[in-house]
From Swiss-Prot:
Pathway this chain belongs to: Phospholipid metabolism; CDP-diacylglycerol biosynthesis; CDP-diacylglycerol from sn-glycerol 3-phosphate: step 3/3
TM annotation in the entry: 58-78, 81-97, 103-123, 124-144, 173-193, 202-222, 239-259, 263-283
Entry protein name: Phosphatidate cytidylyltransferase
Reactions accelerated catalytically: a 1,2-diacyl-sn-glycero-3-phosphate + CTP + H(+) = a CDP-1,2-diacyl-sn-glycerol + diphosphate
Class of enzymatic activity (EC top level): transferase
EC number: 2.7.7.41
Subcellular location: Cell membrane
Listed InterPro entries: PC_trans
UniProt organism field: Mycobacterium tuberculosis (strain ATCC 25618 / H37Rv)
Gene Ontology CC annotation, any one: plasma membrane
Amino acid sequence: MSWLNTKKASCWRSSGRSATKSVTTNDAGTGNPAEQPARGAKQQPATETSRAGRDLRAAIVVGLSIGLVLIAVLVFVPRVWVAIVAVATLVATHEVVRRLREAGYLIPVIPLLIGGQAAVWLTWPFGAVGALAGFGGMVVVCMIWRLFMQDSVTRPTTGGAPSPGNYLSDVSATVFLAVWVPLFCSFGAMLVYPENGSGWVFCMMIAVIASDVGGYAVGVLFGKHPMVPTISPKKSWEGFAGSLVCGITATIITATFLVGKTPWIGALLGVLFVLTTALGDLVESQVKRDLGIKDMGRLLPGHGGLMDRLDGILPSAVAAWIVLTLLP
C-alpha cells in the first residue's frame, strides 16, 4: 500500500522486450480517420481511474467487500482469521514466486507453499515457536530442494560435472520470500489468539488503512517534495505527513476503545504502524523495480495482486505482535 496508492515500476530489465508501437493520431485523437465515431453517436463513458491508471470504482468495491468480510469474521468467528491468513499466505506466496520465476529465478515452489502453511497453522498449538519451527524447516527443505533442481539450470565445472547455476542468488531470493510472506503472515495469525486479539487486528488494520488514505489525499493535493524518488517517484514528504496525522489519530481512537490502552500509547503505536506501513510499501516497490513489473498480480480489480495490498500490512502485523507480547 502506498500513500498515493500509485506504485509505478520502471527500469525494465533489458531482456529483449519489444517497445510498444505508437500510433500516429490526427487532431481527433484516433489513429484512422475512417474509424472515428460518427458525429452525434453515443459514446461509452470513460472508466474513472486514479493517477496510477487504476479503476477507482472497482478498487472501492473490492476494498469494501473485503473489509466487510474481515469485520464479520473478527466479530463473530475470530478463529476463522487463521484460515483467512493461511489462504492469503498461499496466494501471496504464489504471486511472488511466479514473478520471480518470470525474472529468471529458480524458486522451489512446493516446499515454499507447504512450508508457508505449516508456519501459519503451527501457531495455533505452539504460538511463535511453531511459526519459527515451520519457517526453519521450510528454509532447510528449500535449500536442499534447489540442489536437486540443477538439471534445469547448470553451469559447467572444470571437472566436467554440472553444478547448480545461480544457486546462491536463487536461495537468497527464496529465503527473502520465506521471511517476507509466510513468516510475516504467521505473526499476523497470532494476533487473534489473545483475549482481545480481534481488537488488536482491528487496531492494526485501521491504522494501515488510515495511513494509506491520509497519505494519498494529502499527497495528491499538496505533494511537491519527493520522498524516495529512486524507489517510488510518486511518494512525497507531504503525503507522509498526511499518513502520520491520519494514522496516529486512528490508532489513538482504536487503541483507546478497542484494546484499552492510553492515548499516549496509541500515539506511539500510530507512529510505529505508519513507519512499518511505509517501509513495507517501499520494500515492495523496490522489489517490483528490480523485477521490472508494476503489480504482483491481477487478482483484485483496481488493486493489482493480493501482495500489492499486503505490503504494508505484513510488517505492521509483526510490529503489532511484538507490542502485544511486550506490553502488559
